[in-house]
């Protein structure tokens, strides 16, 4: 192949490499690990630790095996609430060993008929894996298409980054779901509480016009959040 004909391929390869690097949810680590020191209010020690995108690093000389261990997913969380669900999140804030590693994991417990309400993760793609029970998982694309699947034990569903989605227990027994993310802090935007429970509030007129409903309905919805 001539030098002239290979030039476009080199340019394309370079462009793809740059694009791939920009699509990574979290920055690539530049060290083996950076166990998080999660800053607390007035914590001068945390402020003195070396910083990296995410949380400050615990001094390597003080890192121990337990920093890379998390037992929280082994225990079911309380689902006795109006939605019938609860989440145990293992992210860089709750599981310091994940800091800078670009991954996190969680456990969703759903009572019969319980729902993990509509929400999105602005910084991560999500894998939904059902450990027990039967769960309807679904998301809506930017084109307004609704994609969903009823998952049984051992089955998995993927939700693209930023898409609004949910998990709903359609079985007659409690369900357990493991969720995995390609970000140490995926973030969560809950649709209901964001729109109707923000502080300060979104004006009723804006919401009523946006949803084409009476302001009384907006006030009713706000009373729920």
From Swiss-Prot:
Binding site for Mn(2+): 119, 121, 126, 165
MF terms in GO: manganese ion binding
Record-linked Pfam families: Cupin_1
CDD domains with a match to the protein in the record: cupin_OxOx
Signal peptide: 1-25
Boundaries of every Cupin type-1 domain copy: 71-219
Keywords: Apoplast, Disulfide bond, Glycoprotein, Manganese, Metal-binding, Secreted, Signal
InterPro entries, alphabetized: Cupin_1, Germin, Germin_Mn-BS, RmlC-like_jellyroll, RmlC_Cupin_sf
Cysteines paired by S-S bonds: 34-57
Role description: May play a role in plant defense. Probably has no oxalate oxidase activity even if the active site is conserved.
Name of the protein: Germin-like protein 3-8
Organism: Oryza sativa subsp. japonica (Rice)
């Amino acid at each position: 192949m001539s030098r002239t004909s290979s030039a476009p391929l080199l340019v394309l390869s370079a462009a793809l490499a740059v694009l791939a690097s920009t699509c990574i949810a979290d920055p690539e680590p530049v060290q083996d690990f950076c166990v998080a020191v999660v800053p607390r209010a007035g914590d001068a020690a945390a402020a003195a630790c070396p910083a990296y995108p995410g949380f400050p690093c615990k001094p390597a000389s003080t890192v121990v095996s337990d920093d890379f261990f998390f037992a929280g997913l082994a225990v079911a969380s309380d689902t006795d609430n109006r939605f019938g669900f609860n989440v145990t999140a293992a992210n860089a804030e709750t599981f310091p060993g994940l800091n800078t590693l670009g991954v996190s994991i969680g456990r969703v417990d759903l009572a019969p008929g319980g729902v993990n309400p509509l929400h999105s993760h602005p910084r991560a793609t999500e894998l939904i894996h059902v450990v027990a029970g039967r769960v309807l998982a679904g998301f809506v694309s930017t084109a307004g298409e609704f994609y969903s699947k009823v998952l049984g034990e051992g089955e998995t569903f993927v939700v693209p980054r930023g898409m609004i989605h949910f998990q709903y227990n359609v079985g007659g027994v409690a369900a357990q779901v493991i969720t995995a993310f390609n970000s140490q802090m995926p973030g969560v935007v809950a649709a209901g509480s964001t729109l109707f429970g923000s502080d300060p509030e979104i004006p009723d007129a804006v919401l009523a016009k946006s949803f084409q409903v009476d302001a009384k309905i907006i006030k009713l919805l706000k009373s729920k959040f």
